[in-house]
Curated annotation (Swiss-Prot):
One Pfam family here: CusB_dom_1
Main subcellular localisation: membrane
Keywords on record: Cell inner membrane, Cell membrane, Membrane, Transmembrane, Transmembrane helix, Transport
Keyword Transmembrane helix set for record: yes
Protein name: p-hydroxybenzoic acid efflux pump subunit AaeA
GO terms for cellular component: plasma membrane
GO MF, one example: transmembrane transporter activity
Name of the gene encoding the protein in the UniProt record: aaeA
Entries under PANTHER family matching the protein: P-HYDROXYBENZOIC ACID EFFLUX PUMP SUBUNIT AAEA, P-HYDROXYBENZOIC ACID EFFLUX PUMP SUBUNIT AAEA-RELATED
Amino acid sequence: MKAFFLTLFRQQAVLIKKMSRVAITLVIVLCAIVAIFRVWAFYTESPWTRDAKFTADVVAIAPDVSGLLSDVRVTDNQLVNKGDVLFVIDQPRYHQAVAQAEADVAYYQALVTEKRRESGRRARLGISAMSQENIDQSSNALETATHQLAKAQVVLSLAQLELERTVVRAPADGWVTNLHVQSGEFIERGNTAVALVKKDSFYLLAYMEETKLEGVRRGYRAEITPLGSEKIFYGTVDSVAAGVNNSSSSANNKGLANVDSNLEWVRLAQRVPVKIRLDRQMGDLYPAGTTATVVITGEQVNNDKKPSPLIRLLYRLREFG
């Protein structure tokens, strides 16, 4: 009897061991299926793109007057404040123009005074002392001198404005970049001398595939991972472009964004620009034009929650497509 129970116990132990192995295998397979499904959904179904660019408002600064650059007061990539002097253009010439215009105004002021006095005197004498034609000529001369004075005053105002425009100032806070002028060079009116990347104007342009736009709405939150970084930043969808250029048509794009396909012989989903506002400005960390990966997470996201190692790994894999 003892041997029977011992054999039965051993058989039950073997059965339990086999069942444990099967259960463990099933759990592992189930976990693998769940993980694969999450990776597949995260990688293919969620609205995301690795083709996103940090972008900023850029002001092309060009002088409103022509002349020699007498002083360049900034260096390339320097941070400047609104109103700071960037460069100065040949002021002596424009000082002379103002002086000449002031002299013309003074001359015509004296001429108007003289013509007004003469016209008044002839009007008081009347036709008893001279002909009506002489009286009319005096009145016309006064009117002509008055118009000449007004014209001279306008010329003076323009000369003063041009003198003021010889000092080119920063229109906003930002970084001076692509500076390609030096003191002593002659610069033409309207020719761009430097670009100013406006501070606190950075945003993200994410080029989303049209097949994923259904999950993109104004106000949705976005997770942003700069290329080569494990840091995640956050933003909000501001808008989706209302149209892009039709690359299949030869018609004029009429100002619409032109987004080229990667491979012309494969039917690819059209990419549409999506503008994303950043929660905080990062112009000092990621210059305009640098790349990031963007995931649209929906209406809410916990900014304080750190991503899991799996999520960080998936972000890294997305950088490689």
